[in-house]
Amino acid sequence: MENLLYLRQNFPHVPWAPVLQGWQLEDYQLCHQMYAEAGVDLAAEPLVGLGSVCRRQSTAEIGAIVETFWRAGLSLHGFGVKRDGVLRYGHMMASIDSMAWSFGARADKIRLPGCQHAGPCNNCLRYALVWRERSCTR
């Protein structure tokens, strides 16, 4: 929280996004409270990152954390969310970044018919869009 305030004060031309950090729901709630006490209304922010999610995203606890802040009106961004996370709580997030599609294409040597690039589709926009569609419609 202090870093965000410093960055916004010294580099106001950059659209810095606050990030909630924690391990358990109570930790994230404390972080949310610290932002509020510093005058940062997270519900008014265009995007709020949710940290410490990757590698734990298939747990019910992460789902509860996402749902808590989604219900509070926060526009959430998930860092490093894998397909399980997209399927479980992606509908509650404004944006997600993920390398899961790229890792899967590389590991499984996936190559879509008709692709003109060399090698598997791990850097292929077409495959990324196919992966996204499959992940969002399951």
Task: Map each language-model feature to its residues.
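Alpha/beta catalytic cores of nucleotide-metabolism and tRNA/nucleoside-modifying enzymes
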Residues: 9, 37, 64-76, 83-138
